Amino acid sequence: MKIVVLQGSPNSKGSTNILVENFIEGAREKEHEVVRFDISKMNIKPCLGCVACGYEGPCVQKDDNEIIKKALLPSDMLVLATPLYYYGMSAQLKIVIDRFCSYNYSLTGKHLKSALLTVAWNQDDWTFEALVSHYKTLVRYLELEDQGMILGYGCGNVSMTTHSKYPQEAYQLGYSL
């Protein structure tokens, strides 16, 4: 299986990255091909809302989003990885998702498998409600097949994350595919 991981944290050595690395390790042990994009290091502009693409055509913006598109369309799975910022996904990840607009119909109906990897400082039971709702809406709209969510409560720094159960859960999710 070909898996595309969109790593949406601007902190390449942070808690989100720990989950991503563990997920990838598990998936590769099962001999899956994994392509990882560290979005914050890429040149991807926000959607202009011009709809010149007609929801299924070339985007007027020429940037690194085309690299993601070329990897994602022939893939079997999409993994969204993000820290929780103000109870939602990072702006970096949201920009990429908004840019799905130009290949909307190609994504919808592919029935890609999907997963969500996320971390937050908070430990309140409601911490991830808005993000999970957004993810589930994307799953429904894009006709994805959710394989699981790793919701890393209380992962405010690398030490907290490393000593939590979540890296192992991310590994297990990757290995279970």
Say what each PLM segment does.
Residues 10-11, 121-123, 154:
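Short, glycine/serine-rich, charged loops/turns that create anion-binding
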Residues 125-126, 157-159:
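Short active-site-adjacent structural elements
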Residues 1-81, 87-102, 151, 159, ...:
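N-terminal beta1-alpha1-beta2 submodule of the flavodoxin-like/Rossmannoid cofactor-binding fold
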Residues 84-86, 121-122:
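Short glycine-rich anion-binding loops that position phosphate/pyrophosphate groups of nucleotides
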Residues 91-92, 108-149:
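Short, glycine-/small-residue-rich phosphate/pyrophosphate-handling segment
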